[in-house]
């Protein structure tokens, strides 16, 4: 990540909006923003493979659900945050991931400029590709600051997105069971 370019760009934005980039409260802002971007965009170029490849053998194939995984990310359209909760269900095929690995999967894909729909897809596809699940179902509920702070200005509006893979695509009863277990 080119932090010098980020700092220069932030200084230009500060000046472009009519502020003095050298005043006391803004002098360190370009460096702060560059450090923040290093942190919140740390998922760029990463996949969840390293997390999901550490799995455990299991002999049954009962559904695993992890819900209320808090995340925050940046909308790639306005570079404003959106945040919420991800709910994950999957059907193992002989292997299960450690529970923290599901949260880490959400984290990897949320640490980059993102849209909610793609975040759903990336998490579900990672479960299928790297864990070898028989099915994956991901529901994300989020509030988007680009809707709350600007434009339509409707704070508190929740956007829900879903994606189903494998067995969840074809089995409505299985999806319904996942919804119930997720409390949705």
From Swiss-Prot:
- One annotated GO biological process: tetrahydrofolate biosynthetic process
Enzyme class comes to: hydrolase
Q: Which residues cross the membrane?
A: none
Reaction catalysis annotation: GTP + H2O = 7,8-dihydroneopterin 3'-triphosphate + formate + H(+)
**What are the protein's UniProt keywords?**
GTP-binding, Hydrolase, Metal-binding, Nucleotide-binding, One-carbon metabolism, Zinc
For this protein, what is the EC number? 3.5.4.16
Q: Which GO terms describe its cellular component?
A: cytoplasm
Q: Which Pfam families match?
A: GTP_cyclohydroI (PF01227)
UniProt GO MF annotations: GTP binding; GTP cyclohydrolase I activity; zinc ion binding
Q: Which domain of life is it from?
A: Bacteria
For the ligand (Zn(2+)), the binding residues are: 75, 78, 146
Q: In which pathway does it act?
A: Cofactor biosynthesis; 7,8-dihydroneopterin triphosphate biosynthesis; 7,8-dihydroneopterin triphosphate from GTP: step 1/1
- Kindly state the subunit structure of this protein: Homomer.
Which HAMAP family does the record match to this protein? FolE
Give the similarity note.
Belongs to the GTP cyclohydrolase I family.
**Designated name of the protein:** GTP cyclohydrolase 1
Which species does the entry assign this protein to?
Streptococcus pneumoniae (strain Hungary19A-6)
Q: Which gene encodes it?
A: folE
């Amino acid at each position: 990540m080119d932090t010098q370019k980020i700092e220069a760009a932030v200084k230009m934005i500060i000046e472009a909006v009519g502020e003095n980039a050298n005043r006391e409260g803004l002098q360190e802002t370009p460096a702060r923003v560059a450090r923040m971007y290093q942190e919140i965009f740390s998922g760029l170029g990463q996949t969840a493979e390293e997390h999901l490849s550490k799995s455990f053998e299991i002999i049954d194939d009962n559904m695993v659900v992890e819900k209320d995984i808090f995340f925050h990310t940046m909308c790639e359209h306005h570079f404003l945050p959106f945040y919420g909760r991800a709910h994950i269900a999957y059907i193992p095929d002989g292997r299960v991931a450690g529970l923290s690995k599901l949260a880490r999967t959400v984290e990897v894909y949320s640490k980059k400029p993102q849209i909610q729909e793609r975040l759903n897809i990336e998490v579900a596809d990672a479960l299928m590709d790297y864990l070898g699940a028989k099915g994956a179902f991901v529901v994300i509920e989020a509030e988007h600051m680009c809707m709350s702070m600007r434009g339509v200005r409707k704070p508190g509006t929740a956007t829900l997105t879903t994606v189903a893979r494998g067995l969840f695509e074809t089995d409505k009863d299985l999806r319904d069971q996942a919804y119930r277990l997720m409390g949705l």
